[in-house]
Amino acid sequence: MTQFAADKPYIVKDMSLAKWGRIEFDMAEIEMPGLMALREEYKDSQPLKGARIAGSLHMTVQTAILIETLTALGAEVRWASCNIFSTQDHAAAAIAETGVPVFATKGETLEEYWDYADAIFHWPDGETANMILDDGGDATMYLILGEKAENDPSVLNHPKSEEETFLFAQIKKRIAATPGWFAKAKAAIQGVSEETTTGVMRLYQMQKRGELPFPAINVNDSVTKSKFDNRYGCRESLVDAIRRGTDVMMAGKKALVFGYGDVGKGSAESLAGAGARVYVTEIDPICALQACMDGFEVVRAEDVIGEMDIFVTATGNKDILTVDHMRAMKDMAIVCNIGHFDNEIQVESLKNYQWTNVKPQVDLVNFPEGHRIILLSEGRLVNLGNATGHPSFVMSASFTNQTLAQIELWTKGENYTNEVYILPKHLDEKVAALHLDKLGAKLTVLSDEQADYIGVPQHGPFKAEHYRY
């Protein structure tokens, strides 16, 4: 048995699933026009030639189309999932069959998760990655924390969660096996593109502290990501996940959505579309007012906790649903999270109670008061744990942004310092334009006089950087 996952060519659940994965890839490509257009546009110039990309993002069918786009543009890629439950095993097998090293299985342990995160940085010839494509910031954090530990081992002395216990153990294991590796690996990185709200928050925190070691592109805040993937994606995938997990009818049920950002908005719309009566909690008066204007009642959780049938956290914060909240819920209330990390719900504290596993990613938690809750995906991303995530079309927009961000950082690295950037408006509009034909949309074209009148180029960009959409 090898010491590290990195020593193996790949780790997937079952290579016999590859044929099934390839069939789904063929279907997904039809729904992902942005990525397919980039393959055609850049097939000759190969802008990612020489890039060694460490990818940490849900290993789904849609991600497979992203991976094959990156390699079609010249990149070498190694991949792991950014969530222990989100891998689609047939997709992982089909990618491994192409020769791309993949380290991902649905239901992997936390120990395996961090071993796989390590594996994406190691090339067989001894080279390390020179680019990161991240979702949630775990791959980026692994390198940065690892280098800190090389200089000061005490930073690993006091893990604050089960997750940190395994992360710290993996870092110690790598330092013991390859002293100085983290400093070398971090120094080789030319840039990172970050997919999601939580990971972007980590990057901005590092920038504020002066600790960001390489340029970063915030893909999440591209309009064609956050206003589409986060909202319209969740609008389709949340109810899908709850239905697959519970078979509960949502019409007439009371649902409480924590947070009314883009993900919360999509989640509330998803539940309302299924006939649920939706309530919202918020800390931000602007988002709270938006929720009211959209027809949702804004409440405090403690005032309604015993009335609700369904609870969905979507804040990106921690300790949103506490054990005390869950002890006060009605019998068989459904509890789930659609934010990136599992600490929105105090799942670790629930380990003190009796659990009954119903089926994969569905558990009953029994409280001494005599009631139970239905916990989905152990508090991790419900739409990827209990279902298959967002539809291919909306992910095409997100992943087209990711590909453009990788090209930008790799080919124009000299233009970027160690700060967090957003893709320019003309690329955001390009991503949108690449998806219009699929929907049969036809743009109106400004006349020269009209363009002059409103002070924009005839063919865009059409909005100022501060425009909010």
Curated annotation (Swiss-Prot):
Chain sites annotated for binding NAD(+): 196-198, 230, 259-264, 282, 317, 338-340, 383
Record-linked Gene3D superfamilies: Adenosylhomocysteinase-like (3.40.50.1480), NAD(P)-binding Rossmann-like Domain (3.40.50.720)
Catalytic EC class: hydrolase
Main location: cytoplasm
GO cellular component annotations of the record: cytosol
GO MF annotation, one: adenosylhomocysteinase activity
Pathway this chain belongs to: Amino-acid biosynthesis; L-homocysteine biosynthesis; L-homocysteine from S-adenosyl-L-homocysteine: step 1/1
Recorded catalytic activity of this chain's protein: S-adenosyl-L-homocysteine + H2O = L-homocysteine + adenosine
Subcellular location field: Cytoplasm
Protein's name in the database: Adenosylhomocysteinase
Alphabetized HAMAP family for the sequence: AdoHcyase
UniProt: substrate binding residues: 60, 135, 195, 225, 229
Cofactor, how bound (note): Binds 1 NAD(+) per subunit.
EC number(s) from the headed UniProt entry: 3.13.2.1
Top-rank taxon: Bacteria
Keywords for this protein: Cytoplasm, Hydrolase, NAD, One-carbon metabolism
Underlying gene: ahcY
InterPro entries: Adenosylhomocyst_ase-like_sf, Adenosylhomocysteinase-like, Ado_hCys_hydrolase_NAD-bd, NAD(P)-bd_dom_sf, S-Ado-L-homoCys_hydrolase_CS
Record's keyword annotation contains Ligase: no
Family to which this protein belongs: Belongs to the adenosylhomocysteinase family.
Organism placement in taxonomy: Bacteria, Pseudomonadati, Pseudomonadota, Alphaproteobacteria, Maricaulales
PANTHER family: ADENOSYLHOMOCYSTEINASE (PTHR23420:SF0)
